């Protein structure tokens, strides 16, 4: 599976409270969550994000509270994947469980700029920066995790098994 998209770049320690602020946790409606995604760190995000776009961030993306709402808000906003130097472990697992592809690749994060166009191949872990004509090697998903992503998350995977 591969995707193409434009980059929204963020720094270190982007926590779940800025991905989807706690004041919106009274809903599980995906569209409602998407309409508030990243608003405490990037007020223009929801107006500028397009289906297929990609979030790139430094270390410890998704730290903070263990809330499934954070990856749901990101995915529902149209983001096709998140690339970071490192992820908080619970965010990593929640993302896989809801079918949001994520990759760790420090080299890519260091070289990618906001607005760059990327192509990401999850089967190989190759990230192509189409804006700079560069390639970076991230960690490919193990086969079982790729199957979960391909089935739009853990529930879809179990249904189709």
From Swiss-Prot:
This is 3-isopropylmalate dehydratase small subunit. Disulfide bonds: none annotated. Its EC number is 4.2.1.33. One of its GO terms (biological process) is L-leucine biosynthetic process. The keyword Transcription regulation does not apply. Belongs to the LeuD family. LeuD type 2 subfamily. Heterodimer of LeuC and LeuD. The lineage of its organism: Bacteria, Bacillati, Bacillota, Clostridia, Eubacteriales.
């Amino acid at each position: 599976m591969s995707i193409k998209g434009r980059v929204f770049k963020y720094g270190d320690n982007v926590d779940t409270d800025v991905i989807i602020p706690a004041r919106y946790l009274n809903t599980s409606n995906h569209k409602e969550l998407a309409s508030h995604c990243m608003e405490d760190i990037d007020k223009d995000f929801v107006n500028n994000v397009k289906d297929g776009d990609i979030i790139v961030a430094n270390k410890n993306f998704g730290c903070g509270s263990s809330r499934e709402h954070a990856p749901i808000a990101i995915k529902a906003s149209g983001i096709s994947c998140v690339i970071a130097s490192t992820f908080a472990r619970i965010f990593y697992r929640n993302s896989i469980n809801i079918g949001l592809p994520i990759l760790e690749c420090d080299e890519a994060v260091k070289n990618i700029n906001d607005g760059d166009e990327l192509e990401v191949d999850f089967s190989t872990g190759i990230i192509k920066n189409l804006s700079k004509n560069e390639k970076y090697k991230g960690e490919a998903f193990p086969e079982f995790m790729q199957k979960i992503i391909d089935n739009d998350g853990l529930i879809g995977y179990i249904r189709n098994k």
